[in-house]
Amino acid sequence: MDLWNWDEASLQEVPPGDKLTGLGAEFGFYFPEVALQEDTPITPMNVEGCWKGFPELDWNPALPHEDVPFQAEPVAHPLPWSRDWTDLGCNTSDPWSCASQTPGPAPPGTSPSPFVGFEGATGQNPATSAGGVPSWSHPPAAWSTTSWDCSVGPSGATYWDNGLGGEAHEDYKMSWGGSAGSDYTTTWNTGLQDCSIPFEGHQSPAFTTPSKSNKQSDRATLTRYSKTNHRGPIQLWQFLLELLHDGARSSCIRWTGNSREFQLCDPKEVARLWGERKRKPGMNYEKLSRGLRYYYRRDIVLKSGGRKYTYRFGGRVPVLAYQDDMGHLPGAEGQ
């Protein structure tokens, strides 16, 4: 094919539907007749015509329900008798929200439950039918709701009255002894048996709160161990300054008269006082001197040469630096 002289290719033609039918027959394909006759009118599709040809659906249920005859009062099936009673009552705000079942007859030889004939707040007894549908019926007049009144007598006893005109029975009584050492007795009369629980009496001062004793012990502890005004753990150089400012300790430590220089006159006593402050009874001068050597490279405490047990404070002690600026030397105070 010549690229410089080429003619535009003709468009491909699609054969009509009548020709497609014959063409598909050669290869075994089926082509629907898509060609429209010239005299076939095109009308809009209506609702009735558009559903023609679809199979009609059967909306009847496959398994029809049997007709259940309606009863005004379904028969309640009793449950087996059980001594373990659970909460069978319904919520008083919505008595229709739950359904319970009535217990069956009690077997011979067992006492009736105190809850037989119990009713809800609406005066109706719930029952459950065979289909599980709760039904409510009005009870007979003999099962009417009984109200109980409570009254307290002059002797401290509690009386319960059911409002039927009978005698009031003492159902609950508590007696408390007022004097020290008396017995406190609590008595219940439940109709089945009498229960009494004795309690040994105790004197009222014995039931004191431990706050007073704790405060007294804390106060004694503060009085015993509060020997300094420093906040937090005290350091060794601070303790030595405290002893130097205390005139009563001049026999064990004192200023030498030179600037910031002091001498340990009794090193054992100073070590003992330091161990008492830090609550270390095994403190001695060897351990104290190791603590002082720790301050050498920090310019807090330095060793003075030529004299034994003689040290001086360095320039990083803020209290002594302030006194030097004001013109008051520590050595002048001791002289």
UniProtKB/Swiss-Prot annotation:
What tissue expression does the UniProt record report for this protein?
Testis.
Family statement drawn from the similarity comment of this UniProt entry: Belongs to the ETS family.
Q: Name one GO biological process term.
A: Notch signaling pathway
Chain intervals for the UniProt region annotation (Disordered): 94-138, 201-220
Cited PANTHER family: ETS, ETS TRANSLOCATION VARIANT 2
Q: Which SUPFAM superfamilies match?
A: Winged helix' DNA-binding domain (SSF46785)
Q: What is its main location?
A: nucleus
What terms describe the molecular function in GO for this protein?
DNA-binding transcription activator activity, RNA polymerase II-specific; RNA polymerase II cis-regulatory region sequence-specific DNA binding
UniProt keyword terms in alphabetical order: DNA-binding, Nucleus
Point out the DNA-binding stretch(es): 234-314
User: Where is the protein situated, by its record's location annotation?
Assistant: Nucleus
Name the record gives this protein: ETS translocation variant 2
Q: Which Gene3D superfamilies match?
A: Winged helix-like DNA-binding domain superfamily/Winged helix DNA-binding domain (1.10.10.10)
**UniProt cross-references to InterPro entries, sorted A to Z:** Ets_dom, ETS_fam, WH-like_DNA-bd_sf, WH_DNA-bd_sf
Q: Could you give one GO CC term from the UniProt record?
A: nucleus
In the UniProt record, does the keyword Nucleus occur? yes
Function description:
Binds to DNA sequences containing the consensus pentanucleotide 5'-CGGA[AT]-3'.
The annotated regions of Polar residues compositional bias extend over 205-220
